[in-house]
Amino acid sequence: MKLVLKISAAAMCLVASATGLKAQGDVAMPFMAIDRSPVTSAMGSAGLASSSEIAYASFRNPAVIPFSEKKGDFGLSYQNWAPKGVKSTNLNLGATMRFGRIIGVTIGGAYQMGAKYDVIDGSGNPKGTFTPSDLMFNAGLGVKIIKNLSLGANFHYASQSLADGVSYNAVSADVFALYRVAGVNITAGVSNVGSSVKSDKTGSFSIPAAAVVAGAYTLKAGKSHSIDLALDANYYFKGGFAASLGAQYAFKDIAFFRAGYHYGGDSLMPSFASVGAGVAFKGVALNVS
């Protein structure tokens, strides 16, 4: 079994105005909507229907796993998130294994460290500093039901520490179906559907749940050249529409060049453009976005 190892680096918000997550009504834990993959983040976060990159499927769409050419995919990534906004340093891990052509499993995790701030007591005296943090764990499964149809589900646990003694947690799930016709992957489902976050002082808040449809197609020119095209559309249940369009050019599966655009509108994630590149050799890849 050939296991593809990906050691990846991702620096988000390098192009245009993607300066972090926008406030959106009473949505809690917006970090659950962040794209953790340096491959898809370079494509405007498009690629939910693509089976070419599956390391971070537990954050995205596990229904793609049975259709992937990879038997295994493992990724580590670092994100310098929102360098001009509310900064955070994100460390992400994803691992996926496919067993035969029928079933695949995926796991992942993310840890975020926010910007340290000074703590002041009720009398105005300094009490030291505090560093907010976010944590997320995932597990998922993808199963091919018939030749051209697969189903997938992810389960997430997320926690957030905003201040000393102030922390929250939530559980959620993603459910997707994927159908392949004439080489085109078409997927639809829901993401981050789950529990609300309750606060003693301000009531209950929803996590960033959305309905999603996406498509992906790979164009091949001989054995040396290929282009992956991806289009995603999200409707957030608390309001707001988002869409992503991205492309990847690959030369002999050794060198990769990527670009994309994400339209955020009034949704949680602002609009941004992104670019990226990657190299791969003997199962080890380095990707930057």
Which residue stretches match the model-derived regions?
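Subset of outer-membrane beta-barrel
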Residues: K22-S289
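Cleavable N-terminal export/targeting peptides
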Residues: M1-F31, D35-S37
